[in-house]
Structure formats: structure tokens, C-alpha cells
């Protein structure tokens, strides 16, 4: 049916609430199941229709069947298919009843579709079926299903849920404790049923045959070619050949308890307590009635979470320009995603002290890059530097990291002492300022709108920080900075300081443990930030990009209330 085509009803129930379509969901010997709609609730339902002239011979039988199906509609259990209503169409000689619709068909269809089902899942199904049988057998009056088989057990595969259905042939035991009519499927019929003197234990026998089929994926007595052969074996106490092909001894013992003679057969309630069915719910994601699983909120698993469904492959390019200081190169990494988003990351490179391979490894770690190898990134860094420094050479020599990528003349003098002094001075500028602007500026219009977490690595546009005068108050340092996310100075211009202090007073407790916000929210794009700074401030800012630290927790706040280890620092 075309999705835009209006579905036409073939017929409706007497109230007009349920409308039946021509689409057939299943067909049995006496019943056809159609798809229907409940107009009141707006849900799809199953419309079962029984041709009465094929199963009934008198008006007494007709009234009895209608009464029993009507009573069955009052049953309410999680392992019993839900009945909504039933009625007899006198003109068409049909019995109709509405039940809930199942998404995965019958248990036989489901098991034949998925052959490699774990025994623990099969045990879960068995427990659900037995719970339904216990409910039926302890009902007042007791209810015998009389036709329990995998074709009459229905599955919601996305929930791991099974329910007993097709109760139209069930029989209620009223004043007596046994029934006397022969009805059912020969392969699943207990020996005493042929003798026309039986009770609810015939359902336990049928359950044993169902479990045998679930374990072996074989229809019971498939070796027989005629119902008469099946009858002869059943009344003679001969078990189906599939029983002897069960590899699990405990499973075979469990099935055998169901298939013994009625005098030795246990009830469904006793069978439910068998050690073989002992529940081990620790392995399951869903169990019947257990609801949703608890989230795995621990540090190791949180690190593996992806905030978007699809991994985006990235394109990367690196360009550079001479820095304001000797021996410094300002590098820009451009990262472009397939969805059109892009990121620019700016960082300094000290040609006398840094090596491209070390910086590349740092990039992979700090920016969580998974689709580029450090060696590939190092080559791009070398290419950018060699375009500015003619005698820069690249060597793949991991054994000599201090000489790696540093082959040039003395046109640049060493700045190691300057870097050291800058690092020492940075220890005097503290993280409270960083925490304040992280908290206050989350919704500033200057935040970059061009980045979104790809599931591969953090694509934050990091803020470049200013260096302020020596008159700023000295504060204790709480975490290190990296070349990709430098630490914000705590000394602010007078107009900004008050705003930051106000934010800090309300958010300090949160900022002290969670200095970050969700990864897929970008920080301020550095180039847009530069538009608001004077050339002097820009020059001072560049001198702060000198150290390598840990950026793991900068710019990220855990979406769950879980404990996190303090970020490790590195140089």
C-alpha cells in the first residue's frame, strides 16, 4: 500500500470503533488474523475472525464459545495477549475478537528467523510463558489453553517479550475438574487429551514441546509423515526424535519433566521454580517487566560515548606564519567535516624546542583525532614550517626526539630561557578567571556556531587569552593549560572583572569540579575574539602559547552526575 494512500475499511465492529483492513497478518485452520485500527486510541490492533460454520454445529455450542471468549477478554496478565473486545456477526456467521498487535509475529517465525539465540534468552521466554500458564490455571474458574504451541505465542522482539495468545479455543473448567473434548494440534497434544479426560496439565505437556522446538528449532515429531503416526507414538509414550538430539543434559531433563505421564507431571507453578530456569538478569539488557536498563555511568564508559550517531570523516590542512617572537611560528589547523561544518585551531610552534611529531601526537590526544595518524599530521606541520624556514628538514627519527625536525641554521636564536620564564609567570595567573569566563560567556554572541562534536574528537574553538599587568592579584593554579587550550589569565580589565566575579560567586562550586561544558558546544572562535583586541593585547597573548598540558576536561561538563578523576597535567 502506498504510504499516501488512504486505507479503506473492509468492515467495522458494531460500535464503529474498530476498522478492519484487507491486509492479512496470519492464517490458521479456523481463524484468519487481519490488521485493524482502534480509532479511539489511534493504535493498530489485530482483528481475528473465526468462521463459525466450520467449527460449530449447534446454537448451544455457539453460545458457549461466545461466552468463553467474552470471559477471556477480562484476563489481565503481562504474559497473556490483551483482549479488547469480541462479538458475533450473525449475518456472516463469524466470531470476531480484537487483541493487541505484536511487531515480530509468532515465536515460531521469530525463532526460525533468528537461529542463534542464546539459551539464556530462551529461558527468559520460558519463564514468561510459564508465568502466563500459572495465571490461567489459577484463575477462577481455571482456564486451560488446550492449543499451546509456538504458533500461538507472540513476540515483541524489540522488548524480548513473549505472550500467550490464540485463546479462542481455551476451555474454562467450571463445576468439574476435567474436560472431555478433543481439540488441538497433534504434535503438541498430551496423551490424556486423546482419552478425553484431562485437566490443565495438558498445557504443561504442550509447553514442553514448545521448549523442545525453541531449543532445537525442530518441529516435534517431524520424523512422522501422518497424524496417525504421531498419535501412535504419543499414546505409546514415545518421545519425538528431536528430544534425543538436545545437547544440553539439563535442558533435556527439564523438557522430560513436562513430557512424562499426567500422574508424574508437575504443575506450571512447580516447573517455574525449577533450578534450570533460575534467572541470571545481570547479563540481560532487558527483562520482562524490568523496564529500562540503568545507564553505565562510569568514567571508562563515559569516555566512549558519542554525542552524535554518525562518525564524520574529516579533512585537515595546516598553514603557518612567522610569529611575533624569534623562533616562533604561528600555525593554524583547519578541520572540515563532510556535513559542511569547519573548525580552526591556532597554536604556536617553537622551532628550537618543539618537534612536529610531538606536537602532532599532542594534537591527536588533545583534539581526540581518530582518523589521522600523528605521522601524517607531522608531515603537514613540516610542510607549513618549511614554507617559512627554507632549511627546515623532516626526519622520521623517534629515537632522537630533541633533534627531531630541528635542522636549520642559526638565523633564529634559542628562546628556551624565554619560554621557561613565561611558563613560570603563567603559574601566577589562576583558573578562577578561566572558570568565570567559561561560566559567563556560554551564551555570548561571539561563540562560534560552526562546530559540532563529530563523535571522533572535540572540535572546540579555543579562546586565546590575554596577559595582564603584574599588578593583578596572584591566585593558586588549579590546572595546566596546553598549546591548544591556553589557561585564561585571572587579571581582567576593570569593566570585565566585576561581571566575572558576579558569575564566579554563583557558579564557583560547579566550576571547581566541572570546569567544562558539553563538548558539542563551541567556545569563542579565536579569530572573532581577536577583532575585539588591540594589537598590544594580541602580542601579549601570543607569549602565553608556550606550554603543553592537558585539555581533556577544558570546555566539557559531564552530562551526568558522575564522579570524574581530576585532569592529569602534562608538559
Curated annotation (Swiss-Prot):
Residues where Phosphoserine is found: 522
Keyword Cytoplasm: no
GO cellular component terms attached to this protein's record: cytoplasm; nucleus
Domain of life (superkingdom): Eukaryota
Keywords: ATP-binding, Kinase, Nucleotide-binding, Phosphoprotein, Serine/threonine-protein kinase, Transferase
SMART domains noted in UniProt: S_TKc
Region (Disordered): 396-425
Keyword Kinase applies: yes
Pfam families reported for this sequence: Pkinase
Gene Ontology biological process: protein autophosphorylation; protein phosphorylation
A molecular function GO annotation: ATP binding
Induction statement: Expressed with a circadian rhythm showing a peak before dawn.
Annotated EC: 2.7.11.1
CDD domains named in the record: STKc_WNK
Protein kinase domain ranges (all copies): 19-277
Catalytic activity: L-seryl-[protein] + ATP = O-phospho-L-seryl-[protein] + ADP + H(+); L-threonyl-[protein] + ATP = O-phospho-L-threonyl-[protein] + ADP + H(+)
PANTHER family from the UniProt entry: SERINE/THREONINE-PROTEIN KINASE WNK WITH NO LYSINE -RELATED (PTHR13902)
The protein, known as: Probable serine/threonine-protein kinase WNK4
